[in-house]
Amino acid sequence: NQRYVAGGWRGQWDFDSGATLLDWGAHTLDLCQWANGADDTMPVEYEPTGKTITCRYANGVKLILDCLETPFGQRPGWVQALGTCPVRFVGDEGWVETGDSGGIEVQPASLKAELQDVTGKRESGLDVATHSRNFLDCVKSRGQTAANSQVMRHSHIACHAAALAWVLNRKLTLDPVKEEFVGDDEANGLRVRPARTPWVF
């Protein structure tokens, strides 16, 4: 089906949740999880609010998924230097935004002094050599890669949970250990689609 190739799969429920959450979310949520020290869990609440989905972790940290029609909305030109999937971290003193190109932008400008200390230590998400080195080192050490299957699994489950909150248009509460929605048969029924006989999950 030509509608499913060359980018045509975007916006299709079967492949992209109809809201690009499974596309852009897959590229960005793992970075948010890592920054929150939450690689082994995921948000516990997902609430659609206008054009965003507000997620909350058990530790109180909020994650806001931006579901604008264009991935980055109407942002200034500097966003292009951050790559295709920028993520913004907002704190008490301002914000830091970075993306898969390794570029970093901060506000207020006074944070740029601290940025100089960080930029020498960072590793770009698009740096193939860094990813390859991490993989080869882990082959030798038998250790886990930085973006291992469990890290990515939790990120993807969070994307799917957010997509279901979006589709149902209501707040969902997720038990991250059981990986099921609390007290919500309808949402739980959407976690896995019925398979054609004789296939089962």
Region roles according to the model:
Residues 5-10, 107-113, 136-141:
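Substrate-binding rim/cap in mid-to-C-terminal beta-strand-loop elements of soluble/periplasmic
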